[in-house]
């Protein structure tokens, strides 16, 4: 098995009979050992050659398929392909979700993006053996301040990497807001998450 190094991208797509209707591209900022610091949308920053590779692969391999698809690449090498949505549901865009439902239901697509905005999806990981307690008021405030907020199961049964389980994920249109909320939650977790999981995080500052 080859080991790839380089830029990790996730392509969140909607297709009809293999024809690309919609594409959003996320860039993953790696933490270590399969864990990620955060993802950000880079759709308008990726070169046309890379995008065309995905479009052409989809047309060649999904010619009879209509619906969501998701691909992951490292340095232009495709490492995963799924017939499902990736992370675009975390935009909390009702119009987009309704358009996808309509595509599945009757094959029509009407969605038009009014304005492109950068989106950031932050995560926090901890050791599998760690119990995590977070003040409910802080969780409620985070849910209010974020576009998307998800507190993950404490048993770590999600598809987590070997080195740690994800504690929560939050999404915002403003990177600084995401950093601030994440730092606030991290610094109020009891017992504290080990430094090796939090010190390398983008923008992390202890209280």
Where are these regions (language model features)?
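Active-site flanking residues adjacent to catalytic metal/cofactor-binding acidic residues
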Residues: 1, 71, 79
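Short, charge-rich binding segments
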Residues: 2-3, 14
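Domain-scale recognition of functional cores that engage charged ligands
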Residues: 5-8
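ATP-dependent carboxylate/phosphate-activation module, predominantly the ATP-grasp catalytic core
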Residues: 12-59, 81-117
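Hydrophobic side chains in beta-strands
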Residues: 13, 75, 124-126
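A short glycine-rich, hydrophobically flanked beta-strand micro-motif that places a catalytic Asp/Glu
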Residues: 62-76, 170
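A structural supersecondary motif
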Residues: 69, 84-87, 147-154
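Peripheral (often C-terminal) accessory segments that flank ATP-dependent C-N-forming ligase machineries
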Residues: 102-207
